[in-house]
């Protein structure tokens, strides 16, 4: 059970602190709207997958439009067709998000985590150095790798598969962290979702998140994710007997994720 201190009152030099019992909550809010209502030092784990800020600037979406309009494949110097003919336009949730937005959220993560609380953030592998710098106030930085056992075979005939793994950084807000594991390499092999089970472009593995939650928290602890998307973090917390506070601003994904967690069809 998690109790949040909501206010303090002083009468005749005596201070009384008022608390409320925290229950799991899945809400339609932006990241800062959600995080701003969370008291400081009250969260055991932030487990999240923010927008990777990769939709714009890559040129890949424009190249896809070029092909759709009847344009020719651009030849790679090695003579092969350009293997990047895929859109990376994940929608408004990624297009409008910036590094400054991520930095504001990370500052809030640090505020709301208890001493010894953990933060795990999945992010674009090519921007991991930037993420590490944003997490400089945290300690015990470690890499986590999700190896996909059934990756989409992009570039399969040209080079190594380009989407066969994802990287996260795990770190701690001072204090002694909860870590229910030993000799852990931080490498996890799980499949991605396909077909009707997949409705979000960056949907994460449920068993992966269940394993991470069990290692970094104990039953009854509170897990926060302000970018819950498909609802995976909330469902993983629910399945492992943890409390969750999760937010999603998109109408479409909020409803789909909420229905998934609440098992509404």
Question: Where are the language model's segments positioned?
Answer:
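Conserved SAM-binding loop
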Residues: 257
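Core catalytic lobe of class I
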Residues: 1-4, 10-254
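Class I S-adenosyl-L-methionine-dependent methyltransferase module
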Residues: 126, 262-265
């Amino acid at each position: 059970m998690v109790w949040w201190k909501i206010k303090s009152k002083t009468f005749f030099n005596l201070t009384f602190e008022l608390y409320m019992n925290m229950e799991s909550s899945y809400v339609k809010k932006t990241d800062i709207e959600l995080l701003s209502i969370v008291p400081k030092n009250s969260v055991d784990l932030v487990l999240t997958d923010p927008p990777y800020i990769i939709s714009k600037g890559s040129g890949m979406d424009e190249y896809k439009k070029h092909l759709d309009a009847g344009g020719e494949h651009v030849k790679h110097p090695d003579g092969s067709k350009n293997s990047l003919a895929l859109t990376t336009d994940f929608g408004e949730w990624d297009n409008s998000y910036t590094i400054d937005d991520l930095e504001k959220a990370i500052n809030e993560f640090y505020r709301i985590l208890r001493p010894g609380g953990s933060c795990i953030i999945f992010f674009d592998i090519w921007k991991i150095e930037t993420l590490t710098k944003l997490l400089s106030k945290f300690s015990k930085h470690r890499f986590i790798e999700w190896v996909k056992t059934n990756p989409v075979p992009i570039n399969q005939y040209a080079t190594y598969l380009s989407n066969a793994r994802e990287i996260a950084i795990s770190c701690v807000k001072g204090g002694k962290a909860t870590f229910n594991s030993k000799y852990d390499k931080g490498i996890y092999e799980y499949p991605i979702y396909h077909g009707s089970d997949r409705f979000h472009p960056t949907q994460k593995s449920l068993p992966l998140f269940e394993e991470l939650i069990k290692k970094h928290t104990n039953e009854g602890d509170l897990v926060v994710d302000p970018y819950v998307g498909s609802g995976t973090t909330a469902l993983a917390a629910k399945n492992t007997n943890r409390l969750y506070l999760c937010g999603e601003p998109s109408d479409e994904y909020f409803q789909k994720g909420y229905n998934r967690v609440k098992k509404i069809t």
